[in-house]
From Swiss-Prot:
Biased composition (Basic and acidic residues): 39-49, 129-151
Organism field: Neosartorya fischeri (strain ATCC 1020 / DSM 3700 / CBS 544.65 / FGSC A1164 / JCM 1740 / NRRL 181 / WB 181) (Aspergillus fischerianus)
Name of the protein: 60S ribosomal subunit assembly/export protein loc1
Biased composition (Basic residues): 181-190
Subunit (UniProt): Component of the 66S pre-ribosomal particle.
Family per record: Belongs to the LOC1 family.
UniProt key word Coiled coil: yes
């Protein structure tokens, strides 16, 4: 077999391609040199744009009244007229005494709320205490009933044992004798 030439994809033999590529590149270079471009055109600005560029436009400044921004709540001095957009609940106080009376009323109301909360807490605590006492009383009652039942059972046993004490002692001795004589080993099959 004849030796195969290694084939490389994307590359062709250098001898043939080098001759072909040179004339193309040289021709393109020549054409670029020969072709003359026209000089770039200057963009002229229009007269009206020049005047507008030179002028500085004055921006309009709005007053606070025109903007209609809401004012912050402040203490209004005596004699000041109420603003137009006054809220319903807003109260303007003319004198110091009136303001202090309103403040005292509000404080008293708040203290009343606090006092009522404390009273409710006390009442709830009393209710809890009463419930706990009732539960303890029920528990003690149950214990007493249980103790009484135990005592009655013990008394019944004592009555039975006192009447039959002689006969039981004879029977128990005879049973123990018979058990000792007749002890047998028992085997159970599972």
């Amino acid at each position: 077999m004849a030796p195969n030439k290694p084939s490389v994809k994307g590359k062709s033999s250098s001898k043939g391609d080098s001759g072909k590529s040179k004339p193309l590149s040289s021709a393109s270079k020549v054409s670029k040199k020969n072709a003359k471009r026209p000089p770039p055109k200057e963009v002229k600005s229009k007269a009206r744009t020049e005047s507008s560029l030179l002028k500085k436009t004055k921006k309009r400044e709005y007053t606070e009244e025109e903007l209609g921004l809401p004012k912050l709540n402040m203490i209004t001095p005596v004699g000041v007229v109420k603003p137009k957009g006054k809220k319903k609940g807003k109260v303007f106080v003319d004198d110091q005494e009136g303001m202090m009376t309103i403040l005292a009323m509000v404080n008293a109301e708040q203290e009343g709320h606090i006092e009522s909360k404390l009273q409710k807490a006390r009442q709830l605590e009393e209710i809890r205490e009463a419930k706990r006492k009732e539960a303890e009383a029920r528990h003690a009652e149950k214990k007493n009933k249980l103790e009484e039942a135990k005592q009655s059972i013990r008394q019944k046993r004592k009555r039975k044992s006192s009447g039959n004490e002689d006969s039981k002692s004879d029977a128990s001795t005879s049973k123990s004798d018979s058990k000792s004589k007749g002890k047998r080993k028992s085997v159970s099959f599972a």
